[in-house]
């Protein structure tokens, strides 16, 4: 274990003249050369000369006193977020080589504030996975233990942070796809309130659940990134015209200001190492003055996972219907439309995506829609109401994952075990609430993460609570190696 710059530390170092963007980008490139072949965190990388040119421009801006908020900060972007200067594949053979004609809104906002985008990070195909193993470009490995998964679907975003190839990253979170990688790579992932960040340019998996989400090596850093990318967008009708305020340690909460609600029945389903780390951390917080309350979630514990997957797979089946072999890189050769579509989808989609499409079509089919899909939407309202009631009085605290990082290949052949990895994280997506995951312990050389779920637009509150936990654990800024 070693330490790397947090974004805040890096910007302070630039400001003081202790380092400059050219030196920093050179260090990042050294980390890439050392780690990337083994980890496979990126699908595509920007050319080195382009990165050095961008670093030189950033250095000039710092010297002239014209630095923007992310000037010289190296950022990785998940490869389901559109970029006009690098391919956007969504981790799928279906989109291999596809370069969009536009940038996603979040990418435009990063570039306007001086971020240097190093490349597009690996992911489970179309963001459908919890381990990072379902990419057409090969699995991503966990830098903390190369025999284990880094979590998914934002696997590359977590992994590149964990070995020092970027200072911050963007992922997308549909049911925990930023928070699971954060838990498994000792990084911080923040899923914002639904609508706070524009989804324009995001290749969709499940529109009503997913959010583009920041990742970094500290809670302050994810808030800084969120400050840049958040806000309304005329190209996304679901976006809201609100912006968070950056939280700093000086204006943050004190332990005695914290109220945590713990769904004890849910936590008890986690592995012993995870459970011990979780209760050890919340116990220390209680010792510092935080208030703990053990609660039930009105049935959310039992129904959240099946409701989530029913809704997500139905939306996925609808979204992926557009890939019919006529518009994107993988095309069918038959002149008959249906044969062309079948051929292209057979070639272009991986096994997990095919499985989810079939299940999504099934729950939407005549005779089953009421029994499955409509029932799931009703359960979603019950879960949302229970969560809104709970976060009105406290932050919901759970482990970020019920298990330690599994070994590569351990869960791919058992969909039920694979999907159960999301049991804690789907609560925030079903209710549209913000949630943060951060490391609380390194156990046997592997990270363990904690999740906090807060009220709508409560990102600053979550960051303040995370600041306290980071002070307690001392794990902000750690990287593998």
UniProtKB/Swiss-Prot annotation:
Keyword Ligase found: yes
Gene Ontology biological process terms, A to Z: translation
Cellular component, GO annotation: glutamyl-tRNA(Gln) amidotransferase complex
Listed GO MF terms: ATP binding; glutaminyl-tRNA synthase (glutamine-hydrolyzing) activity
Enzyme's top EC category: ligase
Entry keywords, A to Z: ATP-binding, Ligase, Nucleotide-binding, Protein biosynthesis
Known EC number: 6.3.5.7
Stated name of the protein: Glutamyl-tRNA(Gln) amidotransferase subunit A
Organism of origin: Aeropyrum pernix (strain ATCC 700893 / DSM 11879 / JCM 9820 / NBRC 100138 / K1)
